[in-house]
Design a protein with these regions (language model features):
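Membrane-proximal intracellular helices of multi-pass ion channels
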Residues: 1-179
């Protein structure tokens, strides 16, 4: 992670500080403006490593031990990635309509900030309050999701939401087909 940050222009000190807080999903920065202080390339690197930090560590162990399907076959990971992508896409379209003309910036800001919030990392690259009440509400609610169980992320975790959804579906089937 630190080497990737250096490759896109961070100093060694900034790269190490931000690598530690990205991989641990700790999210603190040595700058008041957090990732708003850096160029867009740094945000893309952070997106990749925040996603990696939000995945279950046991899947990485399985991957290293030769199970190449460990990550792609996990429903929790699929749910996390799809949720992140869907919410970031929604935020992108809203941002692109609010601030037309710079679609790359809208895409980067939506991916970075949504990944940061859903993973619990807490970095920011923009002032969310300028995005309007609807997107602030979206950010609040995705913060309640969190990453995958078995990762360093905070919040409820995707796995627990999957368990609740399964239990609800099971009960609904029992109500509909009692015998």
């Amino acid at each position: 992670c630190a080497l990737s940050y250096v490759a896109v222009g961070l100093t060694a000190f900034d790269a190490i500080v931000h690598a530690f807080t990205t991989v641990s999903t700790g999210g603190f920065s040595n700058y008041d403006s957090s990732f708003g202080h850096f160029s867009g390339a740094v945000e893309y690197v952070a997106i990749i490593f925040m996603i990696m930090a939000a995945l279950p560590f046991v899947r990485y162990v399985q991957l290293v031990n030769g199970n190449s399907r460990a990550i792609i076959s996990d429903t929790q990971i699929k749910t996390f990635l799809i949720t992140t992508l869907l919410v970031a896409t929604f935020v992108f379209f809203v941002l692109n309509n609010l601030f037309p003309g710079d679609w790359e910036s809208a895409l980067r800001k939506s991916l970075f900030n949504i990944t940061s919030i859903i993973s619990g990392t807490g970095y920011s690259s923009d002032n969310y309050m300028a995005w309007g009440g609807m997107l602030v509400s979206v950010i609040f609610f995705i913060g309640l999701i969190g990453g995958c169980a078995g990762s360093t992320t905070c919040s409820v975790k995707v796995f627990r939401y999957q368990l609740v959804a399964s239990a609800i579906l099971l009960q609904l089937r029992k109500i509909r087909y009692p015998h």
